[in-house]
């Protein structure tokens, strides 16, 4: 988008598709707030205390309407915020415009190039008046990776010398460009970061790997593994948003089709439920025997991708892994098979291997890959998140669960960060239960209460927590 590229070098401290969309975005933000009781009640509870006063949060998370409510909650609690999307296709342009109009710098529009994506990821760390971000709110770990990898490159350029994919080409080029301007750009910013709160499975995996290797430079909160995130956002959110994305993109009738879900974690479970609910015959591929047994006990047929490739109609990857659907799988697929991904990164499908063939764009984020024999495979969102690339992501209510956890984690880390070592932490059980409590009334749920004798009998407080940390919900 030429206008956005021009704006990124102008005096305006934001980059959005069209600021005129702000009015529409504000109307949708107002509607979303009615479905996000956790965030609204957290605002009411903490606003007078201003626990985030002095926090300068660099946010990298899908710039949707629901994220707009999160941003305005963080600001209501005292934070200054700069924001970019964590995916090139996930921004809702009217949401970005509304947040900018309200005074928050946003650098995001739907359909960014990879070069623009990494430029915008830098912009969230470029604070005015010589200040620096002191907190990161991340989804997928790209903002965290940027500072850490850039700091390493200051000392050893070889770490950005050999890109292995087009994403790394853009990232490494962006780091090189910033180092040419300021050789300590990254380390100066890294030194001010008190900690990060991470939203999703993929980013959490990166953090645990850094902790294991002794390379984690600040404390981190794993928001993803809060029960009220992973068992709600990942499961119930995907249960609604996956089929929304597929149907908006293709208008296909799901009933009667064979659908393959690769991965049967929380995300895969939600995907399988939704596809079966619309009448598909659902097959599951798994590498974990426990998850495979769960799928089989739920009535799904557990197969390999090699077996399913030439038989199924719809393929969904939900593993967080690499090349789960490869070139040979796609070559074997039926004419007009639909292929999509709902994991965070685009590496689950080997999209790069299909660039050798003719591509025909049908509409934004919907492409035909035309094989030499004339067969066509329908690829959605270029292998990136289908629910955000081809639809609008999860519903507001379930995102209120996730974002209430994010807000509480930001408060905890900003106000008590000095008490934490450079390790990965999960929010305590009483806060997980608090997040759930904040959402019960909105859906008419009435909570029973233990008597004194009952509480004593099972050895818990009447106010909770009710389960040990190792309990599996």
From Swiss-Prot:
List of residues binding substrate: 64, 139, 199, 229, 233
Main location: cytoplasm
Pathways per UniProt: Amino-acid biosynthesis; L-homocysteine biosynthesis; L-homocysteine from S-adenosyl-L-homocysteine: step 1/1
Alphabetized InterPro entries for the sequence: Adenosylhomocyst_ase-like_sf (IPR042172), Adenosylhomocysteinase-like (IPR000043), Ado_hCys_hydrolase_NAD-bd (IPR015878), NAD(P)-bd_dom_sf (IPR036291), S-Ado-L-homoCys_hydrolase_CS (IPR020082)
Protein name, UniProt field: Adenosylhomocysteinase
Superkingdom to which the source organism belongs: Bacteria
GO BP of this protein: L-homocysteine biosynthetic process; one-carbon metabolic process; S-adenosylmethionine cycle
GO cellular component, one term: cytosol
Subcellular location: Cytoplasm
Keyword Cell inner membrane in record: no
Cofactors demanded by this protein: NAD(+)
One Gene Ontology molecular-function label: adenosylhomocysteinase activity
SMART domains: AdoHcyase, AdoHcyase_NAD
UniProt keyword terms in alphabetical order: Cytoplasm, Hydrolase, NAD, One-carbon metabolism
Listed EC numbers: 3.13.2.1
Enzyme class, broadest EC rank: hydrolase
